[in-house]
């Protein structure tokens, strides 16, 4: 939400975060999104609950909910795949189709968006949530991210109809290029890659 974060947690240590605290019974994602959109400043909101998963279920009921899947893809040289979509560095991902499993969607989307063939689908890295407005409607998108590998260093073909203008392989020591122009959720996903150097 405009680089802001809503943290649903199970503990109640208000000193842990420099944040605004929200009663978990009164989280209205639409209203919160409008407030953040008007303010334009990145903010952190925290809601503490003994049942954060139940709080998430309640939030999902009030907005359009989309499932997506994507990948953090590594080639045989140890370089990672990044795409530039709408002027920002990102990872390939896309919407899960009806009757499609998350893992299947992740592989399909990466292959479609970058014109390559995934050799191995690894473990789920994590799930992220992203809120945005589409056609005047507030959308909550959950994305499952998976580790993936390809043979060799295949050429990349960015899917331009998905607003992807570049697809590149980057070694870990060049990830500062991505960090300077990406989203906070992508920063979280690639945070552990520095240990590979």
Regions found by a protein language model. Name each.
Residues 1-38:
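N-terminal leader/capping segments at the start of a protein or of a new domain
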Residues 16-22, 74-112:
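Conserved Nudix-box catalytic region and its N-terminal flanking loop in Nudix hydrolases
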Residues 1-3, 10-18, 155-197:
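Nudix hydrolase/Nudix homology domain
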Residues 26-70:
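Acidic, metal-coordinating catalytic segment for phosphate/diphosphate chemistry
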């Amino acid at each position: 939400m405009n680089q802001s974060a809503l943290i649903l947690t199970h503990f109640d240590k208000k000193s842990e975060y420099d944040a605004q605290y929200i009663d978990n019974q009164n989280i209205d994602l639409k209203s919160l999104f409008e407030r953040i959109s008007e303010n334009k400043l990145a903010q952190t909101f925290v809601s503490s609950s003994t049942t954060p998963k139940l709080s998430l279920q309640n939030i999902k009921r009030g907005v359009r909910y989309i499932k997506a899947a994507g990948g953090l893809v590594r080639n045989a040289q140890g370089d990672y795949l990044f795409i530039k979509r709408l002027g920002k560095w990102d990872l390939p991902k896309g919407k899960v189709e009806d009757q499609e499993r998350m893992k299947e969607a992740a592989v399909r989307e990466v292959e479609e968006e970058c014109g390559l063939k995934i050799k191995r689908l690894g473990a789920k890295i994590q799930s992220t949530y992203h809120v945005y407005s589409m056609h005047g409607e507030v959308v909550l998108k959950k994305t499952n991210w998976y580790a993936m590998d390809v043979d060799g260093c295949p050429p990349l073909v960015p899917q331009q109809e998905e607003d992807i203008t570049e697809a590149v392989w980057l070694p870990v020591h060049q990830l500062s290029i991505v960090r300077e122009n990406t989203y906070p959720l992508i920063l979280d996903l690639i945070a552990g890659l520095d240990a590979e150097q």
